[in-house]
Amino acid sequence: MTSSTTTRSEALFERARAVTPGGVNSPVRAFKSVGGVPRFIREAHGAYLTDMDDTRYVDYIGSWGPMILGHDHPTIREAIATALTGGTSFGAPGEREVELAELVTRLTGAGRVRFVNSGTEATMSALRLARGFTGRKFIVKFRGNYHGHADGLLVEAGSGLLTNAEGVLGSAAPSSAGVPEEYASLTLVSEYNDPAALDALMRLRGHEVAAVIFEPVVGNAGVLVPTPDFLEALHRVKASGALLVADEVMTGFRLSLNGATGLLGLEPDLTCWGKIIGGGLPVGAYGGRADVMDFVSPQGPVYQAGTLSGNPLAMAAGLATLQTLEADPGIYGRLEAYTAALASGLRAAADEAGVPVSINRVGSMLTAFHQDVPDGSIRTYADAARSDTTGFATWFQGMLARGVYWAPSQFESIFVSGAHTDRELNVTLEAARSAYGGTPV
């Protein structure tokens, strides 16, 4: 289970850098914040990844969330194979997209659902819809919440963009080059888990706000859990006429069959999904109140389209995934139990080694922040940004060398799947004890 060579990954990374920016197709994969050679993966089965050098890892990325059932699940594989016999793309409606939409509306209570090709497309489309429905132009987001890479949302964003930037009540600077300040000026920024700040912003600007978009449980600043008073403040934004938009791209169908909103008792006007809803294939969706969704073309005036939207392979994978989750009511309890045991074991390993670590967890999502504060006390973007990223990088490399593939960023969640068992838990905690203790590999 220990890493011995990265020869083929190194060679592929060198080739990739000659033809792809940074050698990867999504920044976090480059290991820039943790150092070392990014592993190029050959295959994935169950709870394991195998790289091009034949090293096997217990996987806690799960393709950044979609693989809640584990990699190469036989039911999902069979559903994709069956769909493949009928063709790969139609550019016309198909039965599976109707079936998946019916299932999503039943599980979540959404009045209508529209499928797109990514989480970014989902959030981008939902906010365009909110503007079209309300006739207003401003959007409110929260510092450290990541909603994909649409221009107007790359403002005080999380994920690979996490910084210590100082925000204000109102517009803030873009988080990326290439985003005009004019775009960013239409995005107002507030503090996650600060109900007073949100209330103040809405009193001042609420009449101009089309939507407030939020992660019910933050995953791209590390896991941040909402406080009850913040949840109450979120519901109050509706009084201004603004729409409440839940970004459940990460949490949808992971924390419950109705995602984090169901778990927390939230009632958003619109919800965005991705990851699990496509069973590991490229997909996104947005949906919610029927009167709002009826503003989407061709029924309404808000345009949104996509060549591959409703792709039959993605619909088959998503349908099989959600049907499997619904048919196994005990899966969320098992995911909870495994992740709780993982958190407890990490806590004990860090304490034994004298390494400052603070663990945040909800269901099968977890972040171990390298900070000397109590578990669960990291609640904001600014709190998370105080983490010891150098210490985390050292620990990450120690885990990787011992056959455990953790998220290669301090500011990301890890994801547990139904394929993780006591065997993987024991391997992980043994690796953690050695990595925290600095034991040579």
Curated annotation (Swiss-Prot):
Its EC number is 5.4.3.8. CDD domains: OAT_like. Its cofactor is pyridoxal 5'-phosphate. One of its GO terms (cellular component) is cytoplasm. GO terms for biological process: protoporphyrinogen IX biosynthetic process. Pathway: Porphyrin-containing compound metabolism; protoporphyrin-IX biosynthesis; 5-aminolevulinate from L-glutamyl-tRNA(Glu): step 2/2. It catalyses: (S)-4-amino-5-oxopentanoate = 5-aminolevulinate. It is an enzyme of class 5 (isomerase). The modification N6-(pyridoxal phosphate)lysine is found at K275. GO terms for molecular function: glutamate-1-semialdehyde 2,1-aminomutase activity; pyridoxal phosphate binding; transaminase activity. Disulfide bonds: none annotated. It is found in: Cytoplasm. PROSITE patterns: AA_TRANSFER_CLASS_3. It comes from the Bacteria. Keywords: Cytoplasm, Isomerase, Porphyrin biosynthesis, Pyridoxal phosphate. HAMAP family: HemL_aminotrans_3. Homodimer. PANTHER family: GLUTAMATE-1-SEMIALDEHYDE 2,1-AMINOMUTASE, GLUTAMATE-1-SEMIALDEHYDE 2,1-AMINOMUTASE 1, CHLOROPLASTIC-RELATED. Belongs to the class-III pyridoxal-phosphate-dependent aminotransferase family. HemL subfamily. This is Glutamate-1-semialdehyde 2,1-aminomutase. It comes from Deinococcus deserti (strain DSM 17065 / CIP 109153 / LMG 22923 / VCD115). The lineage of its organism: Bacteria, Thermotogati, Deinococcota, Deinococci, Deinococcales.
